[in-house]
Amino acid sequence: MNIKKWIKKSIQKLSHVDNPKFESELLLSYVTKHTRSFIISSDEIQLTEKQYKYLNHLIHRRSLGEPIAYIIKEKEFWSLSLCVSYDTLIPRPDTEILVERALSKIKSNSACILDLGTGCGAIALALASINSNWNIIGIDKSENALAIARINASKLNFKNVTFFFSDWFLNIKKKFNIIVSNPPYVSKKEIKFFKKDIFFEPLSALISDNNGLSDIENIIKNSKHYLFYGGWLMIEHGWRQKVKVQYLFKKYNFHEIESYQDYGGNDRVTIGKKYDK
């Protein structure tokens, strides 16, 4: 079977996903080791029997709801190709808002930045790609996730980012200009209404107690001990949590509190500045 016919067949099997043609091309790229642009321009290429069988196996996995990123073990974030696994959340485009906000507040060429709950390292590595002089630390309490983050840093050859184990601030011994975090913020009640593909991701990185606010409050409460005077805390949160998150920033004496929307127009990131010493 040639690529063109296989894509047509695959689109029918994946008719329930948002972009079946795009995902079919990604799977072809993964199996044939050709770029997606090459596949698009060379649709008469014949698949081997081995490739055909493997592609059908992958299509079956995708039809059951498994995210394409886990199938091809890769996800693009901030134009970086990142390895992902079942131990890491899949980076979302909306999290790039967190990176953009951090970039807008970094004033020093030698800034120190902490990424709490780094997962595959997406936020830390995006920031590391901007300025090699910045000192960036990413922490996580999952050793398996940290292994993926280190693989990504090595693959990208970034020398200005370090990943190590810490349960939030437990093993942090220094202060930072910027602290960023995409923590668990989904409540146990909410999770049941999500699409089924979310259940392939590590629930410990998604669900938080106290209606999704437990980890957020923990970070806001304790981060002031790890920020320099004038430092910024930036947190991603649920689209209906802005008011409560802003309240927590005020409760723990942050200033210049602002919230920002994601690409879909939903409240997604809140930031605050430390003024007290």
Swiss-Prot record:
Keywords from UniProt, A to Z, are: Methyltransferase, S-adenosyl-L-methionine, Transferase
Q: Which InterPro entries match?
A: DNA_methylase_N6_adenine_CS, HemK-like, N5-glutamine_MTase, PrmC_N, RF_methyltr_PrmC, SAM-dependent_MTases_sf, Small_mtfrase_dom
Annotated residues for binding of S-adenosyl-L-methionine: 117-121, 140, 168, 182
Which GO biological process categories is it annotated with?
methylation
Which residues hold substrate? 182-185
Catalytic activity, as annotated: L-glutaminyl-[peptide chain release factor] + S-adenosyl-L-methionine = N(5)-methyl-L-glutaminyl-[peptide chain release factor] + S-adenosyl-L-homocysteine + H(+)
Methyltransferase recorded as keyword: yes
Of which family is this protein a member? Belongs to the protein N5-glutamine methyltransferase family. PrmC subfamily.
Its recorded name reads Release factor glutamine methyltransferase
